[in-house]
Structure formats: structure tokens, C-alpha cells
Amino acid sequence: MKNTADITVLGAGSYGTALAISLASNGHRTMLWGHEPEHIENLKNDKSNEAFLPGIPLPDLLIPEADLATALAASNNVLVVVPSHVFGLVLSQAKPLLRKDSRIVWATKGLEPETGRLIQDVAREVLGDEYPLAVLSGPTFAKELAAGMPTAISIAGTDPQFTKDLVELLHSPKRLRVYANDDFIGLQLGGAVKNVIAIGAGLSDGIGFGANARTALITRGLVELTRLGEAMGAQASTFMGMAGLGDLVLTCTDNQSRNRRFGLALGKGSDVEAAQEEIGQVVEGYRNTKEVYTLAKRLGVEMPITEQVYQVLYKGKSPVDAAKELLSREQKSETSSAE
């Protein structure tokens, strides 16, 4: 019993720990692996993740584990919650240690750095077609989820039984509502693009624009997300759900969002390096911006907001000039195929 679990979570940061807390609170024996032994030892001793979620106790059914082989042997259900730029590396380390009956789900939001490939493509490249895959996405702040505040997410996967099992594992009447979705591509894309738009919303607020401008950015950002999604074979309806509109509104409007705070700092005059230092944790949207920009260019999809956020982050353009360029774009119908 000691070395078995209902699910193993890879990634002991804020979101991985929050999901592990939710699973364990739901009565599931949950093993939580992290790559830093000292951090895992602190979790065991403190019975909380003071580095990322201070003051929130770890349930008795949550077992911190520093050894990857032990963690992966414990369960056939593996939930990967690591930043997108190390997803492939962690999966490569895990591959020789996986059980034959392993099933892989991730909560990583982003695309592969440099190439702009979906996480599913990275997973298939590393693992082949041997294992069922799934993704969970939606409007979630780790602190609220860990504290037991009501949250809703969506799950999509390559195997209907795996998706069904994940819904049953994660769903909790008191804290977490889980929706099954059949749009594997759409759920992955929403989690990446919303980070870019959230930086844009932060930039807008940082330079002194108000709620009107922020709302316009969210609305047109949803248009950009939908346009890119359809070009990749996703369903437009997905982006009106948890992984699209839901995640977009949450990330663009609340200062718990690192991406929004990053944009705010830039809008108020900080450079990229100083803004990242101010946040103190990984800002996924910084890399996501380059990834989404690369993908959009490759597919020939027009994404003006993404373009301007990219120019600010990677080309040194001032936030004010980026805003001016967006506002001075040629007038078009709101419902036309291009902005």
C-alpha cells in the first residue's frame, strides 16, 4: 500500500501541488514528485508547500516523493504539471520508468518553445503511440483550488475510457467540477493563447488604459484564439467554454495571474528582465508569446494583439507604441474573417 497510488503528479510547483491537494482531498492516494529533493523534503517536514502555497496543509493522502522511479511505479495514471519548456525533458526522463499500463495527462499550458508545436506532438515524439494521452485545462488559480474554493475545468483525451476515469478521479462535488470535452487540440491551444492576451491586458492597464480597453482586448483576443484554433482543426465552440473564454477572462482580469502582472509591470516601465524578477515565478506567457507568434506566422493566421505583444517582449517596442498601432489599424467589420 505504501508504494501505490491512485494517481502520480509530476511537478511540485503551485499548480501541481494544488491539483494533488484536490485529488487527495477527494479521497485518492496521490503521489507528488518534484525534481528538487530538498523541496520535497520540505513538503514532508512542513506538511505544506511553503514555497508556493504557504499556509495550506497537505492532506494525509498526499505523498511527496523525490525519486521519479518510485513515483511512476506507484500508479498507471500520470498527471504532468510542469512548464511547457521542460515538458519534453521531463517526459523523456519518465519514459523508461513508465509502467506498461501508464496513461498520461497533462495540465501544462503552452506550446513547444521555438517550434510552436502542440504539447501532444511533443508527447507523441517522446512516447510514440503506446500510451493514452489527455489534457486538462480551464480557469484555475492554484491558490484557490488548493484552498478548496469552487473551480471548473475541462478534460479531453485520445481514449474515451481514460477521459471518463479522469473525470471521476478529479471531480469533487465540494471543490472541483470537471467537464469532458472531445476537442483535444482546442483545449491545448486555449491554455497557451490566453497567456499572451493576458500580458496584453496587463500592458493596457499598465499604461493607464481602463476597463473599456481591457474588455476590447479580451473580446478580440478570443477572436484571435478562435481563428488560430480553427486553422489547426479545433472546434470554435470549445473557445466559448472553460479552456477558452473562461481561462481568458480569469487570466486577463485578476492580479493572481502572473501573466497579467508581468504585462502590468512592463506597461508601467519595467523592462522584460526586471518584470520577470518582480513576478518571482515562471511567466509562461513570455515563452508562449513567441510560440504562438511563430505558429500563427507559419499558418498565415492574422493575430494583431499577439503580434504587438511579441513586438514589446522580443523587439523592444514600447507598450504605448504597440497600443497606438492596434488602435490605428484599418477599420473592418467586427464579423469579418480578419481583424
UniProtKB/Swiss-Prot annotation:
Question: Where NADPH is bound, by residue?
Answer: 14-15, 35, 109, 142, 258, 282, 284
Q: Which key words tag this protein in UniProt?
A: Cytoplasm, Lipid biosynthesis, Lipid metabolism, NAD, NADP, Nucleotide-binding, Oxidoreductase, Phospholipid biosynthesis, Phospholipid metabolism
Q: Which GO terms describe its molecular function?
A: glycerol-3-phosphate dehydrogenase [NAD(P)+] activity; NAD binding
Output one GO BP term. carbohydrate metabolic process
Q: What's the Enzyme Commission number for this chain? A: 1.1.1.94
**Positions annotated to bind sn-glycerol 3-phosphate:** 109, 138, 140, 194, 247, 257-259
- Quote the SUPFAM superfamilies the UniProt record gives: 6-phosphogluconate dehydrogenase C-terminal domain-like, NAD(P)-binding Rossmann-fold domains
Which residues are the active-site ones?
194 (proton acceptor)
* Top-level taxon of the source organism: Bacteria
Q: Which InterPro entries match?
A: 6-PGluconate_DH-like_C_sf, 6PGD_dom2, G3P_DH_NAD-dep, G3P_DH_NAD-dep_C, G3P_DH_NAD-dep_N, NAD(P)-bd_dom_sf
A cellular component term from Gene Ontology for this protein is:
cytosol
List the catalysed reactions: sn-glycerol 3-phosphate + NAD(+) = dihydroxyacetone phosphate + NADH + H(+); sn-glycerol 3-phosphate + NADP(+) = dihydroxyacetone phosphate + NADPH + H(+)
Major location category of this protein: cytoplasm
Its pathway?
Membrane lipid metabolism; glycerophospholipid metabolism
Enzyme class comes to: oxidoreductase
Location of this chain's protein in the cell: Cytoplasm
Q: Which Pfam families match?
A: NAD_Gly3P_dh_C, NAD_Gly3P_dh_N
Q: Which family does it belong to?
A: Belongs to the NAD-dependent glycerol-3-phosphate dehydrogenase family.
User: What role does it play?
Assistant: Catalyzes the reduction of the glycolytic intermediate dihydroxyacetone phosphate (DHAP) to sn-glycerol 3-phosphate (G3P), the key precursor for phospholipid synthesis.
* Name listed for the protein in its UniProt record: Glycerol-3-phosphate dehydrogenase [NAD(P)+]
Source organism of the structure: Shewanella halifaxensis (strain HAW-EB4)
